[in-house]
Amino acid sequence: MKALVGRFTVVAFLLLAFSASPRVRAEAPAEKPFGLPFADPPGPGTWLLGQTYGNTTGAYRQRRTTYNAGQGVHFGIDLSAACGTPIVAIGDGVVSKVDALSHGSAPHNLMIDHPNGYASFYGHLLERPRLTVGQPVTRGEVVAKVGDPDLTCTSRPHLHLEIRDAEEYRHLYNPVLFIEADWDSLALVGSFGRGFERDLDNPRRWQFLDDQPEVALWGGVLNEYARPWPPDWSGR
């Protein structure tokens, strides 16, 4: 009898522990629900993957400055393309924000809410999108144009694309897990992110395209390493 009571106690404790634990990581969808934000295939004359999502070396160097709000990681993907390149909606949805610069990615941006509970965010646009809040859009519909955060169209024109939760827009997810594409091939050329920063005390963590941390805005820097590689000579 005592053994039986003990087993029930252990089971009850485990159930309570799991129910009380916050949900830190969202489940990646079994089938990727979104498409790429360009109608044309990738290539030198169309677009290339510039910087991936996650613990990139570029974000690590700026973890306490530019990427401090995003827990020290690059919380979207950058797709290099010429200014004016048409951007298409990655899925059916409804426009929720236009030029909401509190979300960053100037000079112009766009947020689309999708019925599956996620939102797509398009940043560094050439001009204010000609859409209105509440307007429905369909997957593949042109919604914006690629711009340049430096306003030159020669320094670093690119689309910054994010996947967020559509409720608070505070949680950001790895687009690689949500967008159907040959990411391994895309990562072979065009990258300006120089790969992922490595923690020599945990060298295998966050070293692959599909193994990167989710982000909670203003949740505290995730990648303060005692032994980083490459070394952080700047100390920023």
Protein language model regions, located:
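Short alpha-helix capping/helix-loop boundary micro-motifs
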Residues: 80-81, 128-131
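Zn2+-dependent peptidoglycan hydrolase active-site motif and core
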Residues: 90-129, 156-160
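Conserved, short, structured surface segments that act as functional micro-motifs
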Residues: 110-114, 135-206
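Bacterial N-terminal signal peptides
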Residues: 9-17
